[in-house]
Design a protein with these regions (language model features):
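A C-terminal cap/extension of S-adenosyl-L-methionine-dependent methyltransferases
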Residues: 110, 163-168, 198-245
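Class I SAM-dependent methyltransferase SAM/SAH-binding core
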Residues: 61-107
Length: 245
């Protein structure tokens, strides 16, 4: 895929800011079982350990950032929007010390280069303008042996398209990057960024109101093992490890 021009990237970023700085109640941080399972699934898949320095790309209001910090990761947030980062600070209040950075991941602050054990994100990669360029930039933020890991929607799950049609806070313009979230696209992009041990897996089954119900997590764990369901499970994890120079 050809890299976007700086002007095209800037316009893309402006569209994303307009999209995300709208009032989105679903993005407010909570401690629901649904969100906690996302955090635990990504942390396990990426091999994160408490105390490791972790950068969350596209952290927004801290929906996942706060849960990561509460689990003992030295997490920092990076986002295009100072508005969303200010909301993150208000949710964290005095409970957590969370360094945040207003930047495009393609042009990160120089102080962040080679600084992180992991660069991660939740439902952020499909909003990024240029996958190849952005993943190469993320790899520069890692220590040797560091990992990139993302949780993304599965474009083969038809319920996402129903959501986009029915929920006013979701739009095709804002979320159409989901179509690129296929292993055949993401894994080669990770490898081109200098990463090895590239892998993916799918998980999940229920929407939040069922996943948060009593026994929802146990039922999901059973349904995930049913082979015909596996290609359409709603969530995907992707990872890669920075190869030694």
């Amino acid at each position: 895929m050809a890299e976007l021009t700086p002007e095209a990237r800037a316009e893309h970023n402006r569209r994303q800011l307009r999209y995300y700085e709208q009032d989105k109640p679903g993005m407010v941080p909570t401690r629901s079982p649904y969100l906690q399972r996302h955090v635990d699934a990504l942390a396990g898949f990426a091999g994160l350990r408490p105390g490791q320095r972790v950068l969350e790309v596209g952290c927004g209001m801290g929906r996942y950032t706060l849960l990561l910090a509460e689990r003992g990761y030295a997490v920092e947030g990076l986002d295009l929007s100072p508005v969303l980062l200010e909301r993150l600070r208000s949710f964290a209040r005095d409970r957590l010390e969370l360094p945040v950075h207003v930047a495009d991941v393609v042009e990160p602050p120089a102080a962040l280069l080679g600084a992180f054990d992991a660069v991660i994100g939740f439902f952020a990669l499909h909003h990024i303008h240029d996958l190849s360029l952005s993943l190469r930039s993320m790899s520069r933020l890692l220590v040797p042996g560091g990992r990139i890991a993302f949780l993304e929607p599965n474009p083969y799950n038809p319920l996402y398209y129903v959501q986009m049609a029915m929920k006013p806070e979701m739009t095709w313009q804002g979320d159409r990057g989901m179509l690129r979230m296929r292993p055949g696209v993401i894994l080669p992009a990770l490898e081109s960024a200098g990463l090895g041990d590239c892998a993916y897996r799918r998980f999940g089954f229920f929407p939040p109101f069922l996943a948060n119900a009593g026994g929802g997590g146990r039922a999901e764990a059973v349904l995930e093992r049913v082979r015909p369901f596996q290609p359409m499970l709603p969530f995907q994890l992707f990872r890669g490890t920075l190869l030694s120079a």
